[in-house]
UniProtKB/Swiss-Prot annotation:
<keyword id="KW-0812">Transmembrane</keyword>
<dbReference type="InterPro" id="IPR000515">
    <property type="entry name" value="MetI-like"/>
</dbReference>
<dbReference type="GO" id="GO:0071916">
    <property type="term" value="F:dipeptide transmembrane transporter activity"/>
</dbReference>
<feature type="transmembrane region" description="Helical">
    <location>
        <begin position="105"/>
        <end position="125"/>
    </location>
</feature>
<comment type="subunit">
    <text>The complex is composed of two ATP-binding proteins (GsiA), two transmembrane proteins (GsiC and GsiD) and a solute-binding protein (GsiB).</text>
</comment>
<feature type="domain" description="ABC transmembrane type-1">
    <location>
        <begin position="101"/>
        <end position="290"/>
    </location>
</feature>
<feature type="transmembrane region" description="Helical">
    <location>
        <begin position="40"/>
        <end position="60"/>
    </location>
</feature>
<feature type="transmembrane region" description="Helical">
    <location>
        <begin position="165"/>
        <end position="185"/>
    </location>
</feature>
<comment type="similarity">
    <text>Belongs to the binding-protein-dependent transport system permease family.</text>
</comment>
<dbReference type="InterPro" id="IPR035906">
    <property type="entry name" value="MetI-like_sf"/>
</dbReference>
<dbReference type="Pfam" id="PF12911">
    <property type="entry name" value="OppC_N"/>
</dbReference>
<dbReference type="Pfam" id="PF00528">
    <property type="entry name" value="BPD_transp_1"/>
</dbReference>
<keyword id="KW-1133">Transmembrane helix</keyword>
<keyword id="KW-1003">Cell membrane</keyword>
<dbReference type="GO" id="GO:0005886">
    <property type="term" value="C:plasma membrane"/>
</dbReference>
<feature type="transmembrane region" description="Helical">
    <location>
        <begin position="266"/>
        <end position="286"/>
    </location>
</feature>
<keyword id="KW-0813">Transport</keyword>
């Protein structure tokens, strides 16, 4: 008996003591993996800065983006007075790009949010119940996928009319099937797991299973796709505005600014360069951030 107690004590003494602050939660593991990705961290800082600028754009902008006109410096390039130069109407491009961040970012985020909400609901129901609802939902998605996204958005705006609100609706519509298929695939896998069978065996309702067990299992995929989809939505909204179907002059939206700059690109290329650069950097940042989130949330994909 003494020998047994001695051996047990020896084993206990050999076991490393785990301090409370050494216990790693899923959040700690995610942050540890994410902060190692320098490109993703840089993109995250850029996105945070962009959000702050978008929120306070009208206070940060040195001039009124719509009603300020410097007729003495028409089409002048960048200077100390006008950091990004002046357009053909004498408006300060730097101020318009800052305020344009507010409009373009809001359009992209709201469009993806609407598409994600509807698509997630459709995907959960289709993957969980299958049957006729699954077939109907996926056939609708197939029809929407048959059209290029921008053409579908143009068709929707042509029916609803021009304007930034209708652009958000149009971009949201062609985001729905992408989220629906993503969530449906995850749901089909998760519903076969033993913990779902256990939940059913104790009498959990379908709503409880969907919201408390299946939906949390799809959140990481939704977050990653949501982040990357924002870049696509910003490009789509800017493209519609460039074609004259979105934000209308003098609204300082990036796509609308490019549309107005077409006539002066030869004599004043800076008028188009800075709005285009804003679109490029924003889309790149969201894509890099999405890649980083994917690798941090599911390191097996990276491997």
């Amino acid at each position: 008996m003494r020998l047994f107690n001695w051996r047990r004590q020896a084993v206990l003494n050999a076991m490393p003591l785990v301090k409370p602050d050494q216990v790693r939660t899923p959040w700690h593991e995610f942050w540890r993996r994410f902060r190692r990705q320098h490109m993703a961290m840089t993109a995250a800082l850029f996105v945070i800065l962009l959000i702050v600028v978008a929120i306070f754009a009208r206070w940060i902008a040195p001039y009124d983006a719509e009603n300020y006109f410097d007729y003495d410096n028409l089409n002048n390039g960048p200077s100390l007075q006008h950091w990004f130069g002046v357009d053909s109407l004498g408006r300060d491009i730097f101020s318009r790009v800052l305020v344009g961040a507010q409009i373009s970012l809001a359009a992209g985020v709201f469009a993806v949010f609407i598409g994600a909400a509807i698509g997630t609901l459709l995907g959960l129901l289709a993957g969980y119940y299958e049957g006729w609802w699954d077939r109907l939902s996926m056939r609708i998605c197939d029809v929407l996928f048959a059209f290029p996204g921008i053409l579908l958005a143009i068709a929707v705006v042509a029916v609803l009319g021009s304007g930034i609100a209708n652009v958000i609706i149009a971009v949201a519509i062609f985001s729905i099937p992408a989220f629906a298929r993503l969530v449906r695939g995850n749901t089909l896998v998760l519903k076969q797991q033993t913990f779902i069978e256990s939940a059913r065996s104790i009498g959990a309702s379908d709503m409880t299973i969907l919201l408390r067990h299946i939906l949390p299992g799809t959140v990481s995929s939704i977050v990653v796709f949501f982040t990357m989809r924002i870049g696509t939505s910003i490009i789509s909204a800017a493209s519609l505005s460039f074609l004259g179907l979105g934000a209308q002059p003098p609204t300082p939206e990036w796509g609308a600014m490019l549309n107005e700059a077409r006539a002066d690109m030869v004599i004043a290329p800076h008028v188009a360069v800075f709005p285009a650069l804003a679109i490029f950097l924003t889309v790149l940042a969201f894509n890099l951030l999405g890649d980083g989130l994917r690798d941090a949330l599911d390191p097996k994909i990276k491997g």
